[in-house]
Amino acid sequence: MSKKCEICGKSRTFGNNRSFSLRSSNRSWAPNIRKVRALVDGKPKRINVCTRCLRSGLVERPQFIKTTEEE
């Protein structure tokens, strides 16, 4: 699964771990990515989205219509 948001483009950032003696080792921070069904060009599609885009309402979710069959 890719660690990149398809809405805002947020991806991994890189930095260092710093020990008590101030030696550094490389590390990375990954965004909180969720795979959700969203409407893309009016059609439902499964995309990778960060939780900030989900919470801010930038993702339009498809509506599921419950059908009842009459007997």
Swiss-Prot record:
Disulfide bonds: none annotated. The keyword Ribosomal protein applies. One of its GO terms (biological process) is translation. Pfam families: Ribosomal_L28 (PF00830). One of its GO terms (molecular function) is structural constituent of ribosome. One of its GO terms (cellular component) is ribosome. Keywords: Ribonucleoprotein, Ribosomal protein. Belongs to the bacterial ribosomal protein bL28 family. This is Large ribosomal subunit protein bL28. It comes from Finegoldia magna (strain ATCC 29328 / DSM 20472 / WAL 2508).
